[in-house]
């Protein structure tokens, strides 16, 4: 019993000592990477990513209407069109990159820092948009993953989305 308590305390200390505001453990990122990989095994994975990305972004725009203005240059009015489809794929590819780098923290930090800078220079992008995007993912992923592990995904996605939105003021 004491041994289990010490292990739990040790894990808590590691999580609290981490420089990030999350604790995506090695086991968490292994679970997330495995489950994420299941989604993209199909030979038509780019089409699936585009469709999934469009669903996420149109849901985001529906839930936070001011997001529509941010996506005007990628033609959100024509969500099935090539410009918006390409943007949806870029976003899913960015998320794919981050998930695949979970086991390489220095590379992950560099990639997320780059994405943070890209969003920092876009006027109107807010931390709340990333929070809502995470919520949408958290409700959508269980619908497509049989063994969805909510705690692992929450731990890892929070770190990813927090880092990307870290340079935003609002």
Swiss-Prot record:
Keywords from the named record: Disulfide bond, Heme, Iron, Metal-binding, Oxygen transport, Secreted, Signal, Transport
GO MF, one example: oxygen carrier activity
Highest taxon of the lineage: Eukaryota
Disulfide bridge positions per record: 24-156
Protein name according to UniProt: Extracellular globin-3
Residues the entry annotates as binding heme b: 119
Domain Globin: 23-169
Location of this chain's protein in the cell: Secreted
PANTHER family per the UniProt record, alphabetical: GLOBIN-LIKE PROTEIN (PTHR47217:SF1)
GO cellular component: extracellular region; hemoglobin complex
Record text on subunit structure and interactions: The extracellular hemoglobin of the earthworm consists of 12 subunits that have a hexagonal bilayer structure with a molecular weight near 3.8 million. Each one-twelfth subunit is composed primarily of disulfide linked trimers (chains A, B, and C) and monomers (chain D).
Family statement drawn from the similarity comment of this UniProt entry: Belongs to the globin family.
Pfam family, one: Globin
Signal peptide extent: 1-17
